[in-house]
Swiss-Prot record:
UniProt family annotation: Belongs to the SmpB family.
Function description: Required for rescue of stalled ribosomes mediated by trans-translation. Binds to transfer-messenger RNA (tmRNA), required for stable association of tmRNA with ribosomes. tmRNA and SmpB together mimic tRNA shape, replacing the anticodon stem-loop with SmpB. tmRNA is encoded by the ssrA gene; the 2 termini fold to resemble tRNA(Ala) and it encodes a 'tag peptide', a short internal open reading frame. During trans-translation Ala-aminoacylated tmRNA acts like a tRNA, entering the A-site of stalled ribosomes, displacing the stalled mRNA.
SUPFAM superfamilies documented for this protein: Small protein B (SmpB) (SSF74982)
GO biological process, one term: trans-translation
Major location category of this protein: cytoplasm
InterPro entries from the UniProt entry: SmpB, SsrA-bd_prot, SsrA-bd_prot_CS
Cellular compartments per GO CC: cytosol
Pfam families: SmpB
An MF annotation (GO) of this entry: RNA binding
Keywords carried by this UniProt record: Cytoplasm, RNA-binding
The protein, known as: SsrA-binding protein
Species the sequence originates in: Chlamydia trachomatis serovar D (strain ATCC VR-885 / DSM 19411 / UW-3/Cx)
Amino acid sequence: MGVKEIVSNRKAFHHYEVLETLDAGIVLTGTEIKSLRDHGGNLGDAYVTISKGEAWLLQSSIALYRFGNINNHEERRKRKLLLHKYEIHKLDARISQKGLTVVPLSFFFSKGFVKVRIGCCRGKKAHDKRQSIIEREKNRELAAAMKRSYR
C-alpha cells in the first residue's frame, strides 16, 4: 500500500519556508478516522507544541462525522503526536530558536494508519512571498515553452 494524501496545508507553504520535514503518527478516535476518509479536515491555522516531553497538535480541525451519534468527537481538540524521544527533543530545540515554528503540512494514510507530516518552518517576509511567486511563474512559463517546442 502506498501513501495517500488526505489534507494538505497549502497556506503553510505560502506563509513559511519549510526547512525540515518529519512524519509522525497521531492519536485519533474512530469518528475522526472516518471523517478524514471523507476528506473532512483543515490544517489552516494549526501548529505543534511540546509540553511535558510530548508533542501536541493544536488548532487542527477535523469535521464532525456525518453519521456520528452522541459519541462524535470534538472538532477542534488537542491531538497527541506519536514521535520518538530524540525526535521530540530535536523539535523542542528547533522551537526554542528564534523565528522557527513547527506546523503540520499534511495528513496522509500510510499502510492504513493516519500520519501527519510536520515541518520546521521560518516565516516568510512579504518580499520573500513575492519572490517565490515570481519564481513559480517563471517555471510555469518555461514548462509551457518546453511543451510547445516538443509539438
